[in-house]
């Protein structure tokens, strides 16, 4: 007597090899871990490149003729970071550039105007979100974290309770909503 066939042929899944591309990896179950690995690898490569540039490991064959005059080595003065740009510190951690905030205290420098009301800035108050200079009347303190915020980056929260108006920075406003 011959063997009978399996009655569940339609329900049985095909057992084929499936190619998993990087796109499926980055959007799949391990998306967070995969993106963290890519971020750490990229940060490490950037840090190694910054260290190599700072320690002058690049050989003499490397051409730097395409750099503008203020950035060529041997000239006095460090390159200025763009507003809001973060720098890699000697320990590999990202730090905010404090050059814009310290420029207000330089003697002989032109007075900086407030970004909201265009008054002369009396202190060194800087918005923690956009790093714009602020005067004493335009600075708001975040109710959640205590950071300084400007009119554009601060969010007024009118609650039902007796506290009245609370100002939140954009980071804290995401969690309050």
From Swiss-Prot:
Major location category of this protein: cytoplasm
Tissue expression profile of the protein: In post-ischemic kidney, found in cells lining the S3 segment of proximal tubules at 12 hours and 1 day post-ischemia. At five and seven days post-ischemia, found in epithelial cells of papillary proliferations in regenerating tubules.
GO BP: extrinsic apoptotic signaling pathway
Secretion signal, residue range per the UniProt entry: none
Cellular component terms (Gene Ontology): cytoplasm; nucleoplasm
Co-factor binding comment: Binds 3 Zn(2+) ions.
InterPro entries for the chain: Siva (IPR022773)
Superkingdom to which the source organism belongs: Eukaryota
Inducing stimuli: By ischemia.
Positions carrying Phosphotyrosine: 34
One Pfam family from the record: Siva
Subcellular localization: Cytoplasm; Nucleus
Cofactor dependence: Zn(2+)
GO MF term set: CD27 receptor binding; tumor necrosis factor receptor binding; virus receptor activity; zinc ion binding
Residue numbers spanned by region Interaction with BCL2L1 isoform Bcl-x(L) and inhibition of BCL2L1 anti-apoptotic activity: 36-55
Keywords associated with the record: Apoptosis, Cytoplasm, Metal-binding, Nucleus, Phosphoprotein, Zinc
Role description: Induces CD27-mediated apoptosis. Inhibits BCL2L1 isoform Bcl-x(L) anti-apoptotic activity. Inhibits activation of NF-kappa-B and promotes T-cell receptor-mediated apoptosis.
Subunit (UniProt): Binds through its N-terminal region to the C-terminus of CD27 and to PXMP2/PMP22. Binds to the C-terminus of TNFRSF18/GITR. Binds to BCL2L1/BCLX isoform Bcl-x(L) but not to BAX.
Protein name: Apoptosis regulatory protein Siva
Organism: Rattus norvegicus
Lineage per the UniProt record: Eukaryota, Metazoa, Chordata, Craniata, Vertebrata
Gene assigned in the entry: Siva1
């Amino acid at each position: 007597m011959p063997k009978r066939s399996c009655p569940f042929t339609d329900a049985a899944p095909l057992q084929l090899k499936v190619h998993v591309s990087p796109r499926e990896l980055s959007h799949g179950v391990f998306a967070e871990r995969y993106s963290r690995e890519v971020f750490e690898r990229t940060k490490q490569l950037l840090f190694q490149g910054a260290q190599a540039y700072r320690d002058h490991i690049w050989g003499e064959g490397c051409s730097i003729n395409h750099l503008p005059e203020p950035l060529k080595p041997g000239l006095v003065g460090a390159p200025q970071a763009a507003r809001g740009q973060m720098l890699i510190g000697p320990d590999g951690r990202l730090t905010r550039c404090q050059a814009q905030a310290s420029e207000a205290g330089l003697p002989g420098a032109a007075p900086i105007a407030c970004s909201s009301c265009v008054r002369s800035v009396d202190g060194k108050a800087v918005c923690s979100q956009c790093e714009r200079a602020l005067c004493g009347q335009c600075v708001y303190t975040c109710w959640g974290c205590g950071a300084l915020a400007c009119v554009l980056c601060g969010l007024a929260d009118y609650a039902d309770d007796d506290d009245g108006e609370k100002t939140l920075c954009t980071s804290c406003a995401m969690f309050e909503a």
